[in-house]
Design a protein with these regions (language model features):
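Intrinsically disordered, low-complexity segments enriched in polar/charged small residues
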Residues: 7-9, 483
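Hydrophobic h-region of N-terminal signal peptides that target proteins for export
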Residues: 9-20
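N-terminal amphipathic/hydrophobic interface segments
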Residues: 20-488
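Bacterial N-terminal signal peptides that target proteins for export
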Residues: 1-7
């Protein structure tokens, strides 16, 4: 009974299924057990293999063990611990009784039996049991090679076999910590993978109760053809799928159809697919004589295909993960990239551009744009076999179809070029318009239709050698000169 009592006091290694419940443990196999007692200590040397079994089902095995009564229990060689909640394997382990702390070394493997088999592998692992003065248990993994964790969210245990929702988080880091039953922290070149999603940072934390993952310091996330990076990225899950991702401080996104830079970028998902992007910057300071200009203050910038937009906020709508609309608000400016019509033109008129309070850019699948043109030519013609109806959303290309710029009080402006008719290789005509609202319809990369409402003014300029079209503008070209692209 003496030996059984002493071992029972020592074998509280990890939090068992019934924490705090009394455990009676017995040495069931050992080659030799020798006791050395002094006036100040009592030590048991157990040569093995040493096997212990406890009344609650806990099992402990090691090649040998050293018990310092009331101080520590050291397990040496092929250490194995198992209770109903988890198992631990290591080459060496020491349990310190007063602090209720376990330290395991060399080839440590900690497996959670109750959570779909979550596993932590490391060269060094320290576990501190919950105590009256320490309400939460704490596990720390470190060492070289770096720790690796395979973590299954608890809700994934209800997923069907083979369901992608049951995919674990694969985590590598220099240092890992688990607090309680739901909080995970990692530092030092953190790399996280789950299915096709990859992410990384210098620091990471995951709160399973709140379903929230926070990546800090050089954070990045990749998913299929999408990459997001910032100082800090926070992801909110809904069950096992992404619901909301927010990137803060020097946020940058690169996608197949869109590239965005802003102080903050927020991505909204539905059923795991990106539906909406919102990019914002801090509000501009109050106007002053020496205040910042639109060029100097932080702006949100988006590049969608060949269209560059600059504004205080940018809202991109992508239902089904296909770009359909971008709304640029707040001193907005949009410019199309250089094309064949730009050759030989001054910078001021080399590219089509619009500016105003708000710009709405609408996109369609390239096949839809082609079919709409074909339908206009021959309404009775059947749709092409490879039209948008049969194209995969993730492989179809989108093109700019329409621009609407608004700015009451004549703050809407547009400058666009019109190519010559026929085979005339000369420079294009230039159309500059000021109004309250301007709509441009594009086809084949060129403006085909334009509509302006409100107090409409402007200029239509043709190169020398072309017949000038009469205009109704009352102001001179000098007074109606458009702003330079550098001011936006």
């Amino acid at each position: 009974m003496r030996r059984r009592f002493l071992l029972a006091a020592a074998l509280a290694l990890l939090p068992a299924a019934a924490a705090g419940q009394a455990r009676d443990c017995e040495l069931v196999r050992a080659n030799n057990a020798r006791r050395i007692q002094t006036p100040t200590s009592e030590v048991w040397f157990i040569s093995g293999p040493a096997d212990f079994v406890c009344s609650d089902g806990t099992e402990v095995r090691a090649d040998s063990a050293v018990l310092h009564k009331g101080v520590s229990l050291e397990l040496i060689g092929r250490v194995f611990y198992a209770d109903s909640a988890r198992t631990l394997e290591a080459e060496r382990a020491v349990y310190y009784m007063a602090s209720a702390r376990l330290h395991a070394q060399e080839n440590v493997v900690l497996t959670d039996r109750q959570n779909h088999g979550s596993v932590i592998r490391s060269q060094s692992l320290t576990h501190e049991r919950a105590q009256p003065d320490r309400p939460e248990a704490r596990t720390i993994a470190s060492g070289r090679p770096r720790p690796h964790a395979t973590l299954y969210p608890r809700s994934s245990t209800d997923a069907a076999p083979g369901d992608t929702a049951a995919q674990p988080f694969e985590v590598d880091a220099d240092w890992m910590e688990i607090r309680g039953e739901s909080r995970f922290n990692a530092t030092g070149n953190v790399a996280i993978a789950r299915g096709e999603t990859r992410s990384g940072s210098q620091r990471a934390s995951f709160d399973e109760a709140d379903e929230r993952l926070v990546l800090s310091d050089d954070a990045w996330v990749e998913q299929e053809d999408l990459r997001l990076q910032a100082r800090t990225i926070e992801a909110v899950l809904s069950g096992e799928q992404l619901r909301l991702v927010t990137a803060v401080d020097e946020a940058h996104l690169e996608g197949r159809e869109l590239m965005v830079d802003a102080a903050t970028i927020r991505l909204e998902f539905q059923d795991g697919a990106l539906q909406r992007l919102i990019a914002v910057v801090p509000p501009p300071p109050a106007p002053s004589a020496g205040g910042e200009t639109a060029l100097e203050r932080p702006r949100a910038v988006a590049l969608a295909r060949d269209l560059r937009l600059v504004a205080d906020s940018i809202d991109a709508l992508a239902p089904g993960q296909t770009l359909r609309e971008i709304i640029a608000a707040g001193d907005a400016f949009a410019q199309r990239q250089a094309d064949s019509l730009s050759a030989g033109l001054p910078e001021l008129i080399a590219n089509d551009w619009v500016s105003g309070d708000t710009i709405n850019a609408y996109f369609v699948l390239a096949e839809e744009a082609t079919d709409s043109v074909a339908a206009a030519v021959d309404p009775a013609a059947p749709p092409r076999p490879d039209s948008a109806a049969g194209a995969a959303p993730d492989s179809a290309e989108v093109v700019l179809e329409r621009l609407i710029v608004t700015g009451p009080g004549g703050r809407a402006q547009a400058l666009y070029r019109a190519s010559r008719d026929g085979n005339d290789p000369g420079p294009p005509a230039i159309n500059y318009t000021i109004a309250d609202r301007i709509t441009l319809v594009l086809s084949g990369g060129e403006v085909k239709e334009a509509e302006a409402t409100g107090d409409v003014r402007g200029r239509y300029l043709e190169p020398q050698g072309r017949s000038a079209r009469p205009t109704s503008e009352t102001e001179s070209t000098r007074t109606q000169r458009p702003p330079t692209t550098g001011s936006r």
